[in-house]
Structures are given as structure tokens and as C-alpha cells.
Amino acid sequence: MPYLLSCDIHTHTMFSAHAYSTIEENVYWAAERGLQVLGSADHLSSMVTACPNDLRSYQFFINQDIWPRIWSGVLVLRGAEADIVSLDGSLFGEDTPVTLDIAGDSYSRQHSLFDLVTRNLDYLVASVHNPQIAEGATLAQTTEMYITALDPPQVFTLGHTGRSGLPFQTDEVLLHAKAQ
């Protein structure tokens, strides 16, 4: 019996700087293959810009609400793939202050890049792209890193945990995710 996929929530557009499709091309691809749900999760990461603390570098996330929710018969979810940036499970942008909006006007109060970018998204994928953040870490520490990264309510899943090469207690992380 073949395994049929009905959704893909870890896709990228050209905004991730290593993908070559637009959101429209991804939606049409998903519709042609019978997917019911497509999640676009471009990188919320320093790897997409030379100015990682500038909100203007991430305004494509803020503008995703113009996408149709149902597009060519496919439910389109608005997401991001946020880097896990430290062994404590912190996500990119959580500690990055932003004082100017995309037009260069000052905010009346300080915001974090993470909050501004993710506040209207449907979900996040949390991923390690730089395994050096856990260099010399114990199995317990890397396990706790992944568990902590799952704690923000926007985080729906972890991304490509095997690719990072970081060992962790899979069962502990899965049990934590299930309890969320």
C-alpha cells in the first residue's frame, strides 16, 4: 500500500535564498500533486541577510496575510523555519531588539524581531542549521535544547533533526511534543 502525503509544511520560496520557487509556483506544484495543505516556511535566520537585526530583511513574513488562505484548492499555511541558535533552545530573533518599522519609523515601545515576524504566522518549524552551537554538549543537553525549542506556542515541529548530526533522546522529545 503506497503512503500518500496530503500536506507539506516545510517548504521554502526564493526568500530563503537557497530555493528557486515563488509561493505561487509552490502552490501550483502542491495542487498538481493532490496536496491538501501547503505550509510555506522560509528561513527566519541570519543566513538570509547580511543585516539580521533589520526588520526590512524579513518583511516578506509580515506581508504573507495577502496570500489567499485557499489557493488553487490548497490550504496555504503561513509559517517560518526559525533557527535554534543556542544550546539553551533559543530561537533566532528572540533577543534581537527592533526599534524601527519597515518604513523606518520608530516604534513607541521596543519589540523583538521574533515577535514582530511571527505574530501573524500560523506555525514555526524550529531547526538547527549550525551544529557548532552544541559542540561538546552532552546527550541530556541536546535533548533539553530540542525540548525547549518546542515550547513557544508557535512552534509546531522540529526540522531535519538528523541533518544536524546532534544526538538526542528521541523518545523524550517526542513525549514532550505530544504533551504540548
Regions found by a protein language model. Name each.
Residues 26-41:
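Catalytic domains of carbohydrate-active enzymes, especially glycoside hydrolases
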Residues 20-24:
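Short amphipathic alpha-helical segment that frequently serves as the phosphate-/nucleotide-binding helix
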Residues 2-3:
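Catalytic phosphate/metal-binding cores of nucleic-acid and nucleotide-processing enzymes, i.e., regions
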Residues 6-17, 40-45, 158-162:
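Histidine-centered catalytic micro-motifs
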Residues 48-180:
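Extended substrate/RNA-proximal surfaces in nucleic-acid metabolism proteins
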Residues 38-43, 76-80:
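Short beta-strand segments at enzyme active-site cores
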Residues 17-19, 167:
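Enrichment for repetitive, rod-forming helical segments
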